[in-house]
């Protein structure tokens, strides 16, 4: 009753009329109150039957998810906007390799700019989708397109670094024309895969949380199964193989070079064969490898849960996919858009230098290093080197 629910210090002035009424907890929902009952009538037609009988989520979850999307979206849009502003203002940073970084920033920026406002709007207004079935299809299409482009670009960045660090001068250099070709291919690839559900192979659907839309990963017909399997192989498994292979050979090449130098130094009875310039070169190589591996590892953390839930829902036990379980991989996948600009800001000394010039109030402190003419090939081709001057366009 209300009397039992009331704290003791207010019972004395709670009117007796209210004592026997049943207490109402606005945060509690009866077990019979399902997602289908909670969904507005205009979205019930495209809410997958798998979700109909699940109990409606606690309202606090919607506010929590809305807050998460607000934080991630704001960080992603602001961070990638700064990256693009830096590249546009300082022409010296626009190397062929950095064009790939720019493409990654464009993809991440557009993804969050297009998706996070409606997610925040839905969740803070109670959860259910408020933009109709067509809006749901567009939302899912944009998420898939920009996500595929991000994956393709990260794969090409890893191959470019493999080509420079492992092959060196024997490798094919990345020219501006090649970089533009790769970027064009990445968008064609992304558009091709993201259009498939719109033309009948696979499908887009509203997620169980009802505030976002993505792939239909709970239908187990052969059309949907074949699409999910093909998309997972082409845009998750294949990139993993390429990326892991590239970084394996990068690390192997660095350690092999170190071993050869130690062996030669031992024969000559000297402590080290390295000059200061060589030491800086190897430090750059190791730093690039570490940062790249960290970037890919975080990308795997973001996209692996989504890949797993898609395979589980279409090929496994779909009953294990609850509305909350379906919400976690979707929001994790979007976190990569927020931390990509942070990783690149940390990994590139010259980016930080230009960032400091553009925003002096950020108090960015750089360690001063000796600059020599004998710069490493890796530094010249894969990072913003000490020779790049931050001169505004």
Model-derived features: where do they sit?
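Cytoplasm-facing ends of alpha-helical transmembrane segments in multi-pass membrane proteins
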Residues: 77-88, 109-117, 145-168, 182-184, ...
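Seventh transmembrane helix
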Residues: 242-243, 301, 307-311, 327-373
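Extracellular TM2-ECL1-early TM3 structural module of rhodopsin-like
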Residues: 58-70, 96-157, 163-172
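Loop architecture of class A 7-transmembrane GPCRs
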Residues: 18-21, 25, 44-54, 123-140, ...
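Class A (rhodopsin-like) GPCR signature focused on the TM5-ICL3 interface and adjacent 7TM helical core
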Residues: 153-165, 197-208, 230-269, 291-313, ...
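First transmembrane helix
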Residues: 61-90
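Intrinsically disordered regulatory tails of 7TM GPCRs
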Residues: 1-56, 256-289, 294, 349-393
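Helix-to-loop junction signature of class
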Residues: 66-72, 110-126, 140, 147-154, ...
């Amino acid at each position: 009753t209300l009397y039992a629910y009331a704290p003791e210090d207010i019972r004395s002035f709670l009117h007796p009329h209210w004592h026997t009424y049943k207490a109402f907890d606005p945060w509690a929902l009866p077990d019979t109150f399902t997602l289908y009952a909670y969904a507005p009538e205009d979205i019930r037609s495209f809410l997958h039957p798998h979700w109909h009988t699940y109990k409606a989520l606690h309202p606090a979850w919607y506010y929590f998810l809305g807050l998460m999307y607000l934080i991630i979206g704001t960080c992603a849009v602001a961070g990638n906007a700064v990256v693009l502003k830096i590249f546009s203002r300082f022409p010296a940073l626009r190397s062929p390799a950095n064009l790939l970084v720019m493409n990654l920033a464009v993809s991440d920026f557009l993804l969050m700019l297009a998706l996070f406002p409606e997610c925040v709007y839905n969740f803070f207004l109670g959860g259910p989708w408020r933009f109709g079935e067509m809006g749901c299809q567009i939302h899912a299409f944009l998420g898939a397109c920009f996500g595929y482009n991000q994956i393709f670009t990260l794969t090409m960045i890893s191959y470019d670094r493999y080509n420079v660090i492992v092959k060196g001068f024997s490798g094919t250099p990345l020219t501006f024309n090649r970089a533009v070709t790769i970027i064009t291919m990445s968008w064609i690839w992304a558009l091709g895969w993201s259009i498939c559900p719109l033309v009948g192979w696979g499908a887009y659907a509203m997620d169980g949380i009802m505030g976002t839309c993505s792939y239909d990963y709970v239908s187990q017909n052969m059309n949907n199964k074949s699409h999910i399997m093909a998309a997972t192989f082409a845009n998750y498994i294949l990139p993993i193989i390429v990326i892991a292979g590239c970084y394996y050979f990068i690390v192997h090449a660095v350690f092999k070079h170190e071993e050869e130098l130690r062996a030669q130094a031992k024969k000559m009875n000297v402590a080290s064969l390295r000059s200061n310039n060589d030491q800086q070169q190897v430090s750059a190589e190791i730093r690039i490898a570490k940062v790249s591996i960290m970037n890919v590892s975080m990308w795997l953390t973001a996209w692996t849960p989504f890949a797993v839930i898609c395979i589980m829902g279409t090929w496994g036990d779909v009953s294990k996919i609850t509305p909350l379980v379906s919400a976690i991989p979707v929001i994790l996948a979007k976190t990569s858009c927020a931390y990509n600009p942070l990783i690149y800001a940390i990994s590139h000394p010259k980016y930080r230098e230009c960032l400091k010039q553009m925003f002096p109030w950020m108090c960015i402190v750089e360690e001063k290093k000796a600059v020599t003419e004998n710069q490493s090939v890796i530094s010249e081709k894969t990072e913003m080197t000490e020779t790049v001057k931050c001169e505004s366009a």
